[in-house]
């Protein structure tokens, strides 16, 4: 009965973790393997061979023509669910102007957090244009930023 009480108190957070919960049992039978080692692995054919498949070819739009950006997308999300549009555009290599004016501050923070993660994932950059407008660019787009005069440290993400 003492074991039950100890486990119950641990579960409810009224005591330290019950002893023995951190121990792992090895139920693995080391005599058998889960795969045949007699088979060899062959690499998949290159992309040129896969292009000759009978399936319809997918056309990829390339926003870079001659090394220049041919378009920039402006996104004005209303809810957090609209943030996926940012991810799609950045993933496709299209720079995004993210306008968060009129969005509740808590939602705006979540959208900026998501967008920063997407930009980090594609090795891009994010620049604040105004307190609620951001420029997000993929890695292949270089942004030249002119630093304004020092206004002092800004303590808020959306501060002037």
From Swiss-Prot:
Annotated region (Disordered), positions in chain: 18-72
The protein's name: Cell division protein SepF
InterPro entries hit by this protein: Cell_div_SepF, Cell_div_SepF/SepF-rel, SepF-like_sf
Role description: Cell division protein that is part of the divisome complex and is recruited early to the Z-ring. Probably stimulates Z-ring formation, perhaps through the cross-linking of FtsZ protofilaments. Its function overlaps with FtsA.
Similarity remark: Belongs to the SepF family.
Species this chain originates from: Bifidobacterium adolescentis (strain ATCC 15703 / DSM 20083 / NCTC 11814 / E194a)
Regions annotated as coiled coil: none
Record note on quaternary structure: Homodimer. Interacts with FtsZ.
Lineage, uppermost ranks: Bacteria, Bacillati, Actinomycetota, Actinomycetes, Bifidobacteriales
Keyword flag Cell division: yes
Main location as per UniProt: cytoplasm
Composition-biased stretches (Acidic residues): 18-30
Any Gene Ontology biological process: division septum assembly
CC per GO annotation: cytoplasm
Biased composition (Low complexity): 45-57
Keyword line: Cell cycle, Cell division, Cytoplasm, Septation
Keyword Cell cycle belongs to the record: yes
PANTHER family linked to this entry: CELL DIVISION PROTEIN SEPF
Source species, domain of life: Bacteria
Compartments (UniProt record): Cytoplasm
Pfam annotation, one family: SepF
């Amino acid at each position: 009965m003492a074991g039950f009480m100890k486990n119950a108190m641990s579960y409810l957070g009224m005591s330290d973790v019950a002893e023995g919960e951190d121990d792992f049992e090895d139920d693995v039978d080391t005599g058998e393997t889960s795969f045949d080692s007699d088979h060899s692995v062959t690499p998949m054919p290159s992309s040129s061979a896969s292009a000759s498949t009978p399936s319809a070819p997918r056309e990829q739009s390339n926003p870079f023509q001659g090394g220049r950006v041919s378009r920039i997308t402006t996104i004005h999300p209303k809810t957090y669910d609209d943030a996926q549009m940012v991810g799609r555009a950045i993933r496709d290599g299209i720079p995004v102007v993210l306008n968060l004016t009129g969005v509740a501050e808590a939602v705006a923070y979540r959208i900026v957090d998501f967008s920063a993660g997407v930009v980090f994932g594609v090795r891009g950059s994010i620049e604040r244009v105004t307190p609620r407008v951001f420029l997000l660019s993929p890695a292949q787009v270089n942004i030249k930023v002119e630093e304004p005069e020092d206004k002092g440290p800004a303590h808020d993400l959306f501060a002037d």
